[in-house]
Amino acid sequence: MAEIQFVRGVNEGVVPDVRLTRAKDGNTGRAVFYFDNPQLVQEGNLEIMGMYMVDEEGEIVTREVNAKFINGKATAIEAIYTIRSAPEWDRFIRFMNRYAESHGLGFNKS
């Protein structure tokens, strides 16, 4: 089972919109996760130390996490994971395949 967490041990129930970009050489890339009204925000917990992508292989971590505010209230979270090598890309794709499978998601190539 693959899960995304903002606080270790607490799974985020809102499924994000994920946008991927990849360099022409295929070694580097970027994944932008956008969570609209995530549980973490609904519960009023903004003690975010990072985004943790957890599966049976272990954990992928990004610290580049930002809250979006409207009228002084947090309404969304955007997290960016930068992929710096081909092995990191392969590991990320394995995680995303597991996450998609466990949450009934699909992949659309643009």
Curated annotation (Swiss-Prot):
Q: Which GO terms describe its biological process?
A: photosynthesis
Q: Which domain of life is it from?
A: Bacteria
Q: Name one Pfam family in it.
A: Psb28
> Where is this chain primarily localised?
membrane
Q: Does the keyword NAD apply?
A: no
On subunit structure and binding partners, the annotation says: Part of the photosystem II complex.
Q: What is this protein called?
A: Photosystem II reaction center Psb28 protein
- Which organism does this sequence originate in? Cyanothece sp. (strain PCC 7425 / ATCC 29141)
Give the organism's phylogenetic lineage. Bacteria, Bacillati, Cyanobacteriota, Cyanophyceae, Gomontiellales
**Encoded by which gene?**
psb28
